[in-house]
């Protein structure tokens, strides 16, 4: 929770920067309109999580008698990565977009409590994390600031999760759902222009290399550059 709070504070700080710089960089012009396309890309981060412990047991002659062989504890490091998206404006307030995320978190498995008193050992491997996503966005034009150049938005959608590990020999798949809030800060004027894009929110993942069948909620933040055309 402490990591989530730090990420939230960082996101709020980032959101305030465009308002401070607005007078220097905005030169006017209309906001995105129906038929506009928006291409975006940049970096992202989600914190790691603990996947819990599993004890390997040996069943003896009767089902009620078990013998603990060892215990394994698994955890995943943070998810620093990159994203790309392409969106289409259905109207001035509504757009849809498809995108792709890529990250390489580290999966750590610690073996302890060996029945034969072997020393504890930790094995690390890097996982290739791919996410193909689709979202719908509601652009809050009435809440724009910085002379209209900064337009907040809400976003929600789902994705297909694909994760490779064991030297990319094993493939795990799953689902992802997200609810985000962000801001587009457009630079200059005209139908073709660049902008800055920041957003944060919650991502719920299911399966992948995570053995838990329930949804796992994680905070996530994004920051990057957009191009309107």
Segments predicted by a language model, with ranges:
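Outer-membrane beta-barrel "beta-signal"
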Residues: 38, 136-137, 216-229
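Short glycine/proline- and aromatic-enriched beta-strand/turn motifs that initiate or cap beta-hairpins
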Residues: 22-88, 222
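Transmembrane beta-barrel architecture of outer-membrane proteins
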Residues: 36, 79-82, 129-133, 174-178, ...
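Residue-level signature of outer-membrane beta-barrel architecture
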Residues: 45, 88, 138-140, 183-187, ...
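Flexible, surface-exposed loop regions and adjacent strand-edge segments
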Residues: 55-62, 112-119, 170-174, 212-218
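Cleavable N-terminal export/targeting peptides
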Residues: 1-33
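Gram-negative (and chloroplast) outer-membrane scaffold detector with strong preference
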Residues: 24-30, 85-168, 174-176, 188-190
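Transmembrane beta-barrel strands of outer-membrane/channel proteins
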Residues: 39-47, 98-102, 154-160, 183, ...
């Amino acid at each position: 929770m402490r990591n989530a709070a730090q990420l939230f504070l960082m996101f709020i700080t980032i959101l305030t920067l465009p308002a401070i710089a607005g007078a220097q960089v905005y030169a006017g012009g209309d906001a995105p309109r129906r038929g506009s396309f928006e291409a975006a890309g940049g970096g992202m981060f989600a914190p790691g999580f603990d996947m819990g412990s599993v004890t390997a047991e040996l069943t003896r002659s009767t089902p009620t008698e078990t013998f603990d062989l060892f215990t394994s504890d698994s955890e995943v490091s943070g998810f620093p990565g990159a994203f790309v998206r392409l969106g289409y404006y259905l109207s001035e307030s509504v757009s849809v977009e498809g995108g792709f995320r890529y990250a390489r978190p580290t999966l750590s498995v610690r073996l302890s409590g060996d029945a034969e008193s072997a020393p504890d050992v930790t094995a690390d491997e890097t996982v290739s994390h791919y996410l193909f996503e689709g979202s719908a966005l509601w652009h809050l034009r009435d809440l724009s600031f910085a002379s209209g150049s900064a337009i907040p938005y809400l976003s929600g959608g789902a994705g297909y999760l694909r994760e490779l590990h064991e030297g990319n020999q094993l493939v795990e798949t799953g689902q992802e759902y997200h609810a985000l809030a962000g801001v587009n800060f457009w630079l200059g004027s005209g139908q073709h222009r660049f902008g800055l894009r920041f957003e944060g929110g919650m991502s719920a993942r299911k399966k992948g290399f995570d053995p838990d069948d329930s949804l796992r909620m994680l905070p996530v933040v994004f920051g990057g550059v957009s191009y309107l055309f």
